[in-house]
Amino acid sequence: MIQPPIGKKVLVEVPSTTANLGPGFDCLGAALSLTNFFTIKRIDGDSERFELIMESTEGNHLRGGPENLFYRAAQRVWKAAEVEPFALEARVKLAVPPARGLGSSATAIVAGLVGANALINDPLSKEKLLELAIDIEGHPDNVVPSLLGGLCFTAKAASQRWRVVKCDWDDSIKAVVAIPSLRLSTSEARRVMPKTVPLGDAVMNLGSLTLLLNGLRTGRQDLITDGMHDRLHEPYRWKLIKGGAQVCEAAINAGAFGCAISGAGPSILALCKEDKGRNISQAMVKAWESEGVASRAPLLNLQTKGSTWYSNQSK
């Protein structure tokens, strides 16, 4: 397959994601209406040249070079499509802050895969991109909804194949995501978790997940409230998030159906009806402020379309 001409570029939009939603550890994730934008261009130079230009204050510590996560994803596309690697430039506008539990690394992986594939005229199927994304990230709960959009349940079947189920999400349900100035790496959040859990905790999580999925499908508040309880990861992770329990309590008192750590944290997800969103947002920000932590708490929708790309001529 022939390399694209120097100067060819595409714009890739990739949504943020919230993973786990309480009981769905490492298998449930949803795309949200907070989006990163990547303008990707083939440039002249050595095949390992990767120029990263940040057009926002978020992520200004990130660097280019061949070890960059975005560029590593692009290289996986070229290898699968049997294309010789080429130099790239990526201009990035980040709305999804790194190390906050909103799938920032997943947006980089998905943008690298989708953008590199688009530059060489989309030879790889979405199914192949999905396989590559999970392999790079190591778990599916962020990259799958980031690529496909919506609420996604992903599991490795007994056949060792990844199976993805798009789940229904009632339009009346909105998400308030409180994003603190704190940072928390996924590796740190995983280190505090035990290698085994009591059988009763595992059974409780199965029940909670079933209630949550049915509540999200029907919009029933009682099912969401009872379903957003977890015993596999949250009991061990709350201690890493300063003021997290108080923020969650404030959201519930302001009218949220339920609360959960977003991904590995430290951001906190609250599900609610739209008319409660503003009060919940203010309550969560105030609760963190009382702990000396600055934050913001946007009211977000489910993003259903997933990642999309546009040619330079069309956008």
UniProtKB/Swiss-Prot annotation:
Enzymatic reactions: L-homoserine + ATP = O-phospho-L-homoserine + ADP + H(+)
Family in the record: Belongs to the GHMP kinase family. Homoserine kinase subfamily.
Domain of life: Bacteria
Matching InterPro entries: GHMP_kinase_C_dom, GHMP_kinase_C_sf, GHMP_kinase_N_dom, GHMP_knse_ATP-bd_CS, Homoserine_kinase, Ribosomal_Su5_D2-typ_SF, Ribsml_uS5_D2-typ_fold_subgr
Subcellular localization(s) per the UniProt record: Cytoplasm
Protein name: Homoserine kinase
PANTHER family according to UniProt: HOMOSERINE KINASE, HOMOSERINE/4-DIPHOSPHOCYTIDYL-2-C-METHYL-D-ERYTHRITOL KINASE
GO biological-process terms attached to the record: threonine biosynthetic process
Pathway: Amino-acid biosynthesis; L-threonine biosynthesis; L-threonine from L-aspartate: step 4/5
TM annotation in the entry: none
Claim: Repeat is one of the keywords in the record: no
One term under GO cellular component: cytoplasm
Organism: Prochlorococcus marinus (strain SARG / CCMP1375 / SS120)
Coiled-coil segments: none
EC number from the UniProt entry: 2.7.1.39
